[in-house]
Amino acid sequence: MKTIIVIGAGIVGVSTAIWLQRSGFKVTIIDQKGPATGASHGNAGILAASSIIPVPNPSLIKKLPFYLLSKDSPVFFKMSYLPKMFPFLISYLSKSNLREVNKYAERMTPLIFDTVCQHKSLAKGTGAEKFISYQDYCFGYETKENFLNDKKVWKLRQKHGLPFEVVNGNEFSNFDPFYKDLFDVIVKCKNHGKINDPGLYVKTLCDHFLSQGGELIISKVNDISSKNLNDVIVKIESDSLIANKIIVAPGAWSKKILKKFKIKMPLESERGYHVEYVEPNFYPKVPMMLTSKKFVITPMDGRIRVAGLVEFAGLKTLKRKPPLNLLKNNIKDLFPNLKCKEKIEWLGHRPALVDSLPMLGYLDKNKQILVAFGHQHLGLTAGAKTGRIVSDLIIGNDIKLKISNYRPNRFMN
């Protein structure tokens, strides 16, 4: 039986491990903290099939002065970190044009359009099935003018076959009074889903993996190297492990692990925040993206999660108050009557490459090391399918998308 090591126990790593295990491989997951302790824990829980518009887009350039100078900006920069990330930022912002947005949409759609079905297939026969539900994902616009300013965005989604319905905000509030008097226009995206507790979902999947004979090692990975044409060595804190293949999928921490391979990897953390309102006095019925404020309100089991924003401050900086205060102040202004038992604050690291596409494929000519990371805001959405693709690559099955779009060496000169 061939042995495989998966580095990373987020949704991408756990999904990969389960699909490989189902195909008959002996699989070990290594993670420095354990399953779903990063972005897979604290995301908004949306299976966002329509999220084919990257963060760097024409509107980002138009609003950049506001984002840099306003305390109400949904994009945050730690000024002392800017010099370090300046080359990344220049390349990242250079993608903020229609040609690059169209390219991204064309390449991301095949990875996420069937996200709910992919997650249902992944979770089938496990205790994690109960966390998945079909759910419209809504976008709220405070004015009709704001909606019309986004017309190109919706035309692009329509072009890629993503169904949606535009409804009057007042009529919508009859269905969901939580959002009463907030929006003139609401767009309901169909064929979407929700994970009711993303962290517990991934942990439950990992528990299933372990129950089927998989292994989980909690350790930092110090090095990976090729032993010979058949084996790869992974050095962890207290041991060295040998496997036939290694999958590198620790999200924003991938760059450090792969540094020795000298592959060009313009990767940064798009830091995201959430505030949870535990046992609130009233709930929304559906998840809502507040388009002007760039955060999502998601009803979850026993709480409301308010998640979003983008912050560039690196992996080492701890939670910062300005993004959290912005989320809390916005909720206080929008929902003055909302009360809760407790508020829980969280920071996570989304792995983002300059073109916003993941790295997915073999790193070396001997096909021993495979990478799967860089899904930025869409790790949960694309995670189940990414795991299946990795499994298919190793087995040699046909893959029904153009895998070269995500090749690891695409940034090499």
What annotation goes with each model-predicted range?
Residues 86-204:
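Rossmann-like flavin
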Residues 45-46, 51, 55-95, 223-231, ...:
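Active-site substrate-recognition segment that forms the wall
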Residues 22-41:
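Glycine-rich FAD pyrophosphate-binding loop
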Residues 1-10:
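Beta1/beta-strand and adjacent pyrophosphate-binding region of the FAD-binding site
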Residues 167-175, 217-232:
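A conserved short coil-to-beta-strand element within the FAD-binding core of flavoproteins
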Residues 135, 140-144, 170-175, 269-270, ...:
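Flavin (FAD/FMN) cofactor-binding core of flavoprotein oxidoreductases
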Residues 13-14:
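N-terminal Rossmann-fold NAD(P) dinucleotide-binding loop
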